[in-house]
């Protein structure tokens, strides 16, 4: 009897987690005063996820999503690590394909790598501002573990600087 209940409990928890993760990626409207932003990259594992976490941390009036033209399976662990250094947790983010967002309306669609800019699909919804902010891919860095981690930090800091400036401009336009 205990095994049966345990099995049933585990099945229910698995279903709950599956539904919760699907709901977490579901686009919502930003409302009258919110700014709805989509950040795109190739795999949606490093740059776009760091930008997503940073931009969302600046204020509650920005609704942020991220996607990839070829989304990978999970967020890069080094990206998660360097974001934790800033007390931003992106460990529960799930890479998504940009196709999930093509019919949505967006205030901003931002590409953070050249490949995403070149292969960005046509959005069927209204896109008010399309911006490209290209960054090197820190996952391509080679060398010692510390050197690679420092590359992730450098890209994180570059994204932070540029996206905070963009956030301030967004606030002025509201």
What do these predicted regions represent?
Residues 49-51, 76, 119-122, 142:
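Short glycine-/acidic-enriched loop or helix-start segments at secondary-structure transitions
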Residues 24-100:
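Conserved active-site segments centered on acidic
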Residues 45, 114-117:
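Short glycine-rich anion-binding loops that position phosphate/pyrophosphate groups of nucleotides
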Residues 1-9:
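Bacterial N-terminal signal peptides that target proteins for export
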Residues 27-29, 120-174:
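Phosphate-binding/catalytic loops
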